[in-house]
A protein has these predicted regions:
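Proline-aspartate-enriched helix->loop->beta-strand connector
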Residues: 181-196
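Active-site and ligand/interface coordination hotspots across diverse enzymes
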Residues: 1-114, 174-180, 184, 232, ...
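Charged, often glycine-rich, active-site loop that binds/positions anionic groups
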Residues: 141-173
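A structural signal for short, well-ordered beta-strand segments and their strand-loop junctions
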Residues: 58-62, 137-147, 192-197, 241
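A substrate-binding/cap region within the structured catalytic cores of diverse enzymes
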Residues: 97-143
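Short, solvent-exposed loop/turn segments at secondary-structure junctions
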Residues: 64-68, 149-153, 198-202, 244-248
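C-terminal capping/extension of enzyme domains
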Residues: 1-34, 164-182, 201-268
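A short helix->loop->beta-strand "cap" motif at the edges of active sites that frequently abuts
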Residues: 56, 189-191, 232-238
Length: 268
């Protein structure tokens, strides 16, 4: 990992995340409570960004990480260990930073991955973009994930899109995270930036595109499928975007991958 990126990541994890979430909860929601979990540190990235195939990988960008329901294994396997490591780091134990980075790098290989979330994406990647892989092996060197807002919440509906677009380039924590995003993109050089949901779409369009992404016919009208190009911190990247995966009328599911992939092939 580039030393500049490593230093930026450490400084980000040393931030007072409780103060950051208190502030963000007020400014990212019209109700003065965006629902961000104040006791949980942010996650800057997910996946082995050092092992990515430069120019032949995907960066999945979503809105923010989901806080699991009570009793879910992630509380014991991922979240509480992360809280302990960051507490050690902020107490002066710099070795905890290396341990924490390993947990993020090995997320998909250490048995803690939330495959219920990542399989629907990995399925499409393996079937249509990185065909030598399967839906899980694709995360080893061809895909990693980040979020626009790197703080957990149970329900992202309280996060106001317009406020996020305003704050992502002005709030000190979100601005720092955008610098990390740019550095990771520069290091991994993904062949596609995959935007899952309108929050990520609006942020990328506002900050990194010359204009709106191009909607793709009927798929664009119903599922928000749109393509385009962005430049993040000086690194050009093609953008593949759609409404958030889900179960609503306007939310795509894994059955839409073949049509999405055909549209992408035609566009590129």
């Amino acid at each position: 990992m580039d030393s500049g990126l490593s230093s930026s990541l450490m400084q980000f994890m040393l931030r007072d995340h409780e103060a950051d979430t208190d502030r963000l909860n007020q400014i990212l929601s019209s109700s003065d409570d965006a629902g961000l979990v104040r006791r949980m540190p942010p996650i800057p990235f997910t996946g082995d960004i050092e092992s990515m195939q430069q120019g032949d990988c995907a960066c999945l960008l979503g809105i923010n990480p989901l806080w699991p329901a009570p009793g879910k294994p992630a509380h014991e396997t991922e979240l509480r260990p992360a809280m302990r490591l960051i507490k050690r780091l902020r107490a002066g134990d710099r070795s905890a930073f290396a341990e924490y980075m390993r947990t993020r790098m090995t997320y998909f290989s250490s048995g803690i991955a939330n495959w219920g979330h990542f399989d629907k994406v990995g399925h499409g990647y393996a079937e249509h973009f990185f065909t030598s892989e399967d839906k899980r092996s694709v995360w080893e060197s061809h895909a990693f994930a980040m979020d626009v807002v790197p703080y957990f919440s149970r329900d992202a509906t309280s996060l106001d899109r317009g406020r996020i677009v305003e704050q992502v380039s002005s709030d000190p924590a979100l601005r720092h995270h955008q610098r990390i995003l740019a550095a990771v993109i520069a290091e991994a050089r993904p062949s596609v930036l995959h935007l899952n949901g309108s929050h990520a779409i609006q942020v990328v369009e506002a900050l990194y595109c010359d204009g709106p992404l191009e909607r793709q016919g009927e798929l664009g009208s119903q599922y928000g499928l749109r393509f385009g190009e962005a430049r993040i911190g000086g690194t050009p990247v093609r953008v593949f975007a759609h409404n958030q995966f889900g179960y609503g009328r306007y939310n795509p599911s894994k059955k839409h991958w073949p049509a999405f992939a055909r549209a992408w092939a035609d566009w590129t």
